[in-house]
């Protein structure tokens, strides 16, 4: 595959005003996308965004660039990422564009894309866009300029879709739900989804001001949600991130329920009903307890690289339906085309109602193992991960764990770090073993550095 200059694993992201998240680049990006998609024909693209103040600026730049390429634009306004994927399909658009930096704070923003079927753009299209970006911008003749329209009922359309992902007879009328919208794109959607299904909803994180997205709230900061669940005596808390593609839960006792546990609940229910369709996909970072719980059901479990993009790729490759990440990216391909926090939460709520069980009862079948993650500073992360002495040290520790734990080394793709993760049955022992392994690796790193020729 050709080397990418602009696209990362999930679009283009960065600090607003720095790197490529600026009006000049984004306008040309819109033009390049338009040229590649249109290829001389009239096309339509939908654009949605989260609640960051920079979203207005970037939306205008994209709109101008797309229009210059002769592409019509449908503006959705604030809309969860999975909602944009859904509306790309239903509006028969040729692509969907998301302006969001997901769970990051407001200073960051990003651009990512969906194809006409609501999936990720193929690599070939991303590479074609990159090639187009190297050319000089040329505006189509005035008679062929693209037009922009606003889809005023976008939120209502997506709300109805979310409700349709659980059985039509499902009622949430006996449930009290706290939902934290992270002052993000779900603020005007998630509370309505749950209340229209009959739940008693206590919403928080629903007052976005352009600057408070993900700020001490949402799926990455669940303490406020936990406190509210206990304070109001709720049955469940639902924590979404700024663009609505992640979800974590809190049970009535105040316990955090992460993505691994949510995957288990959904997969077990589908397996018991005979509608799971194959196995379950986690990632290299998924807790070993999830693997044990899933395989104990007689269900296959596979790990992809970290990132919802890779979970989706493996699900499609195997024609499986359920997968996700510990962070709360939950993919139900029998319902959606991408990770969807609201839809994942609805699956769990439907199971609670159908089985007449509390959330803590549904998580009883999965025992998460204590996990220690150490970020080891090194300039030789990739070399260390493949070093024979390091590999032997890992094998020695795995032998000591005796099949009741796991060791994982991951070089960071963005920082001079080697991430060392150890899982096992005993938290204090796992922590001790992780530190001992890191000490061994540090010694190997030191010897390696000393042996390298100086520059």
Curated annotation (Swiss-Prot):
Record-linked Pfam families: PGM_PMM_I, PGM_PMM_II, PGM_PMM_III, PGM_PMM_IV
Cofactors named for this entry:
Mg(2+)
Post-translational modification as stated in the protein's UniProt record: Activated by phosphorylation.
The record's EC number reads: 5.4.2.10
The catalytic activity, as recorded, is: alpha-D-glucosamine 1-phosphate = D-glucosamine 6-phosphate
Cofactor detail note:
Binds 1 Mg(2+) ion per subunit.
Query: For Mg(2+), which residues are the binding ones?
Result: 102, 241, 243, 245
Looking at the keywords, is Plastid present? no
Which named protein is this? Phosphoglucosamine mutase
- The species this protein belongs to is Legionella pneumophila (strain Lens)
The root-end lineage is: Bacteria, Pseudomonadati, Pseudomonadota, Gammaproteobacteria, Legionellales
